[in-house]
């Protein structure tokens, strides 16, 4: 069976180190999820695993770098790789989309390897019946094994079932790829990746654009996969459901524990077995140990330095010996010098041992997200929450033909509401109506307090009302405090990573004097650490909050009111 093995892998883009001394194994039964902050190198690691990039040093073994001609003369890599948010098989027929191609042409190209394999199998079967030879029999055995691995006999059935499960069953196959939405294209490529049955499955954010049924189908497929699965995801419920282990590319707390114990600590990734919940507990415990170790070490360091300083003085500094003991002064001075020197040397040795195992200061709060506790209104006074009474938002029979089924609810000042519903149920339509007014074809009534601020689900663009114009040229400045790392404050907004652009949106929204703060898909683009931090600060925030999300992890742990939209429109 296939196994992906990284051994002391280093990789950089030019002079910028990305991966440093990364080692791990992903075996046939592993569903290994790579996690870490935005920009740390998760997608780069997947590209290395699929053979699309070569490491600076170290070795990578596995299907992507093993013999790609499993069944001559059929040429196809044995692994599959998916670009961020756009699952994409790595074999040549899918390498790069041509917008003029149709859905049918893409499907034909993606399944051509399996169909060629089946044709080769039929040819060998007939040929061996007429003129058998040891060479042909050996090839027949290899082809048969590959047919079984790929389940080639059921490719048409599996194709239809997978397209249906990913909400593509009714897709017109004569349509050009350019006419598909980004979500449709992403789901189509994911479907073709799964149908192709590579030896190893390598996926980057595979649940993007999937509804609940699609995520469940993908989870079942991964459970049943005959081979290693290596992937990244920010979908915590999906990770909880599928992962057998997580690989953290930010091993800071585990390094600190290793340093304190005198063990090697130059590893660039740390593996935690089990589910996402197991990972959270392990990471929290490691961070707690790191914090406690640092505090104990600093206290011991201060004690040793103080003792070393005091050891230079024996007795009382202002004491003058009496006449009768002056004769012994040299004797006592020599003895004091010996004691002092021994104490100083002992302290120096202890300080050297401590320095060898001294851990860096924990800085786990620096990447945290935090809303201001007091929000001011545009008139200069404090906002109505948390003390004001009454209704901040009332929705009465609101509907939009073909986009939003009739819905009604109320939100009082200081309350938190989560709007849930399947893809296409109108979550975004509803939030945009509340923030910007009724769209064409709207019916019913929406009455909201003045000062509604909406963070859209997409990344910011020039001209967005939430973003000051100068942020695109000068950066977000101190407005990013509590959201964006200080090193990114003075960089133009468009140069920031997707995760930091999302943080910037949240930062401006939190400081926008909002009577009602609305966030459409708050978990989009954020890494797992940021997601956990954002949830904590939203939970503690005293303002009026309305969010929409498909994040099942957040929905099942939601602390406020929950309103589900009807799929019928």
Task: Place the predicted regions along the sequence by residue.
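ABC ATP-binding cassette signature C-motif
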Residues: 1-289, 377-569
């Amino acid at each position: 069976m296939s196994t992906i093995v990284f051994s002391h892998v280093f990789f950089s883009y030019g002079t910028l180190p990305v991966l440093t001394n990364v080692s791990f194994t992903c075996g046939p039964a592993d569903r290994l999820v790579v996690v870490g902050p935005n920009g740390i190198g998760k997608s780069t690691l997947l590209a290395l695993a699929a053979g699309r990039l070569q490491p600076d040093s170290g070795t990578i073994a596995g299907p992507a770098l093993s013999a790609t001609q499993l069944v001559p003369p059929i040429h196809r890599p044995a692994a599959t790789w998916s670009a961020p948010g756009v699952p994409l098989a790595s074999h040549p027929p899918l390498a790069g989309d041509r917008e003029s191609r149709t859905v049918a042409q893409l499907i034909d190209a993606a399944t051509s390897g399996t169909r060629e394999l089946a044709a080769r199998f039929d040819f060998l079967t007939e040929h061996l019946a007429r003129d058998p030879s040891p060479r042909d029999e050996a090839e027949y055995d290899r082809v048969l094994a590959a047919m079984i691995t790929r389940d080639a006999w059921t490719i048409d059935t599996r194709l239809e079932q997978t397209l249906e499960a990913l909400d593509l069953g009714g897709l017109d196959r004569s349509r050009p790829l350019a006419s598909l939405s980004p979500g449709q294209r992403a789901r189509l490529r994911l479907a073709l990746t799964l149908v192709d049955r590579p030896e190893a499955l390598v996926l980057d954010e595979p649940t993007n654009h999937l509804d609940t049924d699609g995520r469940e189908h993908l989870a079942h497929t991964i459970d049943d996969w005959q081979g290693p699965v290596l992937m990244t995801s920010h979908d915590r419920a999906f990770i909880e459901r599928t992962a057998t282990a997580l690989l953290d590319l930010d091993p800071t707390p585990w390094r600190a524990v290793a340093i304190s114990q005198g063990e090697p600590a130059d590893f660039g990734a740390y593996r935690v077995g089990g589910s996402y919940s197991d990972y959270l507990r392990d990471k929290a415990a490691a961070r707690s140990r790191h914090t406690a170790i640092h505090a104990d070490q600093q206290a011991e360091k201060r004690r040793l330095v103080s003792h070393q300083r005091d050891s230079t003085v024996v007795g009382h500094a202002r004491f003058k010996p009496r006449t009768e003991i002056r004769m012994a002064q040299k004797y006592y001075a020599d003895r004091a010098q010996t004691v002092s020197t021994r104490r100083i040397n002992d302290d120096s040795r202890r300080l050297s041992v401590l320095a060898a195992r001294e851990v860096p200061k924990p800085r786990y709060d620096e990447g945290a997200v935090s809303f201001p506790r007091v929000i001011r209104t545009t008139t200069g006074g404090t906002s109505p929450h948390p003390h004001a009474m009454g209704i901040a938002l009332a929705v009465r029979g609101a509907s939009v033909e073909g986009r939003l089924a009739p819905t009604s609810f109320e939100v009082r000042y200081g309350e938190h509401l989560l709007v849930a519903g399947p893809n296409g149920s109108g979550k975004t339509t509803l939030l945009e109506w509340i923030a910007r007014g009724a769209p064409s074809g709207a019916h019913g009534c929406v009455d909201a307090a003045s000062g509604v601020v909406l963070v859209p689900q997409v990344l910011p663009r020039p001209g967005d009302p939430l973003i000051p114009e100068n942020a695109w040229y000068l950066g977000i400045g101190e407005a990013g405090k509590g959201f964006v790392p200080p090193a990114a404050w003075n960089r133009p907004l468009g140069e920031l990573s997707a995760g930091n652009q999302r943080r910037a949106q949240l930062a401006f929204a939190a400081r926008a004097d909002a009577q009602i703060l609305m966030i459409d898909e708050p978990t989009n683009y954020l890494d797992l650490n940021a997601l956990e931090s954002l949830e904590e600060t939203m939970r503690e925030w005293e303002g009026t909050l309305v969010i929409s999300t498909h994040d099942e992890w957040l929905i099942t742990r939601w602390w406020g009111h929950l309103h589900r939209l009807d799929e019928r429109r």
